[in-house]
Structures are given as structure tokens and as C-alpha cells.
Amino acid sequence: MIWHVQNENFILDSTRIFMKAFHLLLFDGSFIFPECILIFGLILLLMIDSTSDQKDIPWLYFISSTSLVMSITALLFRWREEPMISFSGNFQTNNFNEIFQFLILLCSTLCIPLSVEYIECTEMAITEFLLFVLTATLGGMFLCGANDLITIFVAPECFSLCSYLLSGYTKKDVRSNEATTKYLLMGGASSSILVHAFSWLYGSSGGEIELQEIVNGLINTQMYNSPGISIALIFITVGIGFKLSLAPSHQWTPDVYEGSPTPVVAFLSVTSKVAASASATRIFDIPFYFSSNEWHLLLEILAILSMIVGNLIAITQTSMKRMLAYSSIGQIGYVIIGIIVGDSNGGYASMITYMLFYISMNLGTFACIVLFGLRTGTDNIRDYAGLYTKDPFLALSLALCLLSLGGLPPLAGFFGKLHLFWCGWQAGLYFLVLIGLLTSVVSIYYYLKIIKLLMTGRNQEITPHVRNYRRSPLRSNNSIELSMIVCVIASTIPGISMNPIVEIAQDTLF
């Protein structure tokens, strides 16, 4: 009899939960329509993988790319709509969140064609790779729109778990296993630190989890200047510093970049930074509204450390992927300037604009590295010597992307940095901007060193890798080359295109 009553209660509780979930999906599902498209694409991939004995590779890539493009289209149709909070306050849709979601989708759309030939040549499992990429993209999109502490914790964990699996995708490679282990341990530690910080926010605000309600709770409890908030701020800064690869939480980055498959590195190098930047902006700007001076100071210190450490250590690297790892640490230091400047002086618009250019510059560089690695099997910088004599198109593409990363005019990277530094200067961040300018000059040095090697390698310096290099025809259906061409063109956009991009970015402000 007791078991029968308990069973009935369980059925009733399950029915209530199901009906509540159905009600939320029915009335709030339109707010996550782009995410639902990706979920539908994931289900299709799983169905095809489980029902078909022979994998139709082009069809799998078509489904993945189509779901990403359709999700981008859904975002564009929703542009300029009124901000809305859905799912009982867990998720918020506004222009600011949506443009970061657009950037994440753009990264994934460019990374999938960049990975096609690499996966086929290395004979890795294709369906699982696409599932992990789409799931990580989904986690990043939910993180951009997260409006409460639980979603802010769960969404990056969804992204991180897929990132761990992708970084160790080449299971027989010892370096890949080492990279995955370090990434997993450091990621778990940073997540624990974030949860500890959230517990301080939760307790200090009187049990609130929504971002805006936390602010109201801190006002009601008079705890907005308490030591607990300072502790939460420090722990959140450390946790987000890991996600963004900010010094001194950057130690995992070079090892993961070097050990992971190159297309995976290309994907992680941009999507993780875009998603974490969106989340950091909202967390610092809303719950820590009353501690703006404190978190400004903390981020300034981390930005300076990242710009100096990243660019100085990059000079000494012999591996192309490790060099780009340290370069990305310096690059995120520039992005932090936009977060510190904030809404008042166009900081968010400059940050978004620079991130758009950074995506094209970084993915273009990695596309060149993937092509060179597939044709030579090496990642050493010295092995690029004299590449121009064998493949001028690839050498010029790599040179343009590197020059744009360094910020030389008239390439896109120059105008992106110029606008970012100008906004920082107007906001009074003189020392931070000066450090940014000096470290940009340092970065130009090691980029030019590689370009000199590409163009002027003497015969005695050319390694067997380049001597035996097989150049592909100029017109090719190679998906990596197509992705590379798109990124190179976007990296060389002249400054005349800056104004419309900045104006669009201005519409994303709170």
C-alpha cells in the first residue's frame, strides 16, 4: 500500500515536471529558436550515425554547416527586437548577447570546412567530432544569454566538456593526452573557484541567483561593499581569467594548443574567448556594479600581465602553435581594454569590432597552418623557410594574416587596435594603452621574423619538408583553402569598412 502511494506520488511529480517543461518550451521556446535549430541538427546527426552503416561524410558536413547557417539566419531575423527574459529568468535575449552568439556561430561555421580534409587524412571519427563542435557551440550560445548563476555555471561546463574531448581527439598521440589531462585538471579547478565565488554572491544577496536580482538583494541586505563581495570578485576574476587565458592563469594554453589537433585549436582559440568575454562583461557590469573601481583595477593588472607575458614569451617559441598560443594571451589583453572602458566611451563596440577581426585573422592563420601541416607533417617555425618559392599563395595568405594580427596598416587588425586603443585613451587608461602599443610593436617583431623566413629562406636554410612540398593548383575545391580565402579577405578589409561595423556594434550596448 505504501509502495503504491509512493508510486502514484512519483508519477504525479513527474507529470508536473513534464508539463512545466512543456509549458516553458511552448511559450519560451521562440526565445531560443537559434539554439533549437542546433539541437535539431544534433539529433539528425545522431539519427544518421545510429541508423546508417556507411557514413556519408559530405552529408554529415552539410547537416552541420546548414544548421549553423540557419541558426545565424534566425539570429539576424531577430535583430533589434526588444530585450526579453525567458525561462523563469534563466535566459535573456538582447542585441548585446545576440551579437556574441553570432560571433560564436561564425567561428563554428568557418571551423567546420577548415576541419574536413584534416579529419579525412588523419582518419578520425567524423560524426563525434561534429557532435562535439555543435554541442560546444550550443554551450557557448547559452552562456552568452545566461541570466542567472546556475546557467552561467552549467553552460560553460557544456562547452568545456566538449573542449576536453576535442583536445584529446587523437588518442594515440602522447602530447594530445597530456594536453587533455592538463586542460581537464585546470578546467575543473577553475570551475570550482567560480562555484565558490557564486556561493558568496548567493549568500550576500539573500539567496538570489538572477543577475539583476542579485544587485537588488545586495542593496536590500546592505552587503554591496562587504568583504564577501570582495572575495567573490577575486574568485570570479581568477575563474574567468582561466577561461580567457589571462596571465597568470595561462599555463594550460601553450600545452593544449601544441597537443591538440590543429582544427580543434582553431575552434577553441576563438569560441572560448568570445563566450567568456560576453559572460565576463555581464558578470562584472551587473552584480559588481558597486565594485567597479575594484574590478577595473584587477582587470587592468591582468591585461598588462597578459600583454607583456604573452608577447615576450612568444618571441622564443619554435613551434607555430605554441607561438600563436602566447600571441592569443597577448591578444586577449587588448580585448580586456574594451571591457574596462565599458559602455560610456564605446568600449563594448570597439571590443566587438576587434573580436570580429580577430576571428578572421586567427582562423586564417590556423587554416594556413593546417594546410602546411597536412602537406609536410611539421609544425616547426624553421620548416616554413622558403615556402614562398614552393607555394606563393599559401605564403602570402599566412603573411597577410600575421601582419593583421600584428596590427600593421592598412589591414583590419590595425584599425581594430586603433579604435580599441583610442577608446581606452578617451577613458583615461593611458598606462594601459601605452603598454598595449609597446607590446604590439613587440608582436610585430616575431610576426615579421616568420614572414622573413617565409619569403627569403636561403637554399641552405630550406628544410626537406619544403623541398618536397607539393603545391596544390590555384583553383581548388579544398574546403580548407576556401575557408582560408574568406578569412584572409576579412583580415585585409581596409579601414573604410570600420564605420559601419562600429555603428552596428553600437546597437548592441545595454
From Swiss-Prot:
Subcellular localization: Plastid, Chloroplast thylakoid membrane
Keywords for the protein's UniProt record, in alphabetical order: Chloroplast, Membrane, NAD, NADP, Plastid, Plastoquinone, Quinone, Thylakoid, Translocase, Transmembrane, Transmembrane helix, Transport
Catalyses which reaction(s): a plastoquinone + NADH + (n+1) H(+)(in) = a plastoquinol + NAD(+) + n H(+)(out); a plastoquinone + NADPH + (n+1) H(+)(in) = a plastoquinol + NADP(+) + n H(+)(out)
Bilayer topology: Multi-pass membrane protein
Any Pfam family: Ndh2_N
InterPro entries per record: NADH-Q_OxRdtase_suN/2 (IPR010096), ND/Mrp_TM (IPR001750), Ndh2_N (IPR045693)
Residues annotated as transmembrane: 24-44, 57-77, 99-119, 124-144, 149-169, 183-203, 227-247, 295-315, 323-343, 354-374, 395-415, 418-438, 482-502
Example of a GO MF term: NADH dehydrogenase (ubiquinone) activity
Source taxon at top rank: Eukaryota
One of the record's GO cellular component terms: chloroplast thylakoid membrane
GO BP: any one term: ATP synthesis coupled electron transport
EC number(s) per entry: 7.1.1.-
Subunit structure: NDH is composed of at least 16 different subunits, 5 of which are encoded in the nucleus.
Function of the protein: NDH shuttles electrons from NAD(P)H:plastoquinone, via FMN and iron-sulfur (Fe-S) centers, to quinones in the photosynthetic chain and possibly in a chloroplast respiratory chain. The immediate electron acceptor for the enzyme in this species is believed to be plastoquinone. Couples the redox reaction to proton translocation, and thus conserves the redox energy in a proton gradient.
PANTHER family the record matches: NADH DEHYDROGENASE
Family the UniProt entry places it in: Belongs to the complex I subunit 2 family.
Protein name: NAD(P)H-quinone oxidoreductase subunit 2 A, chloroplastic
Name of the encoding gene: ndhB1
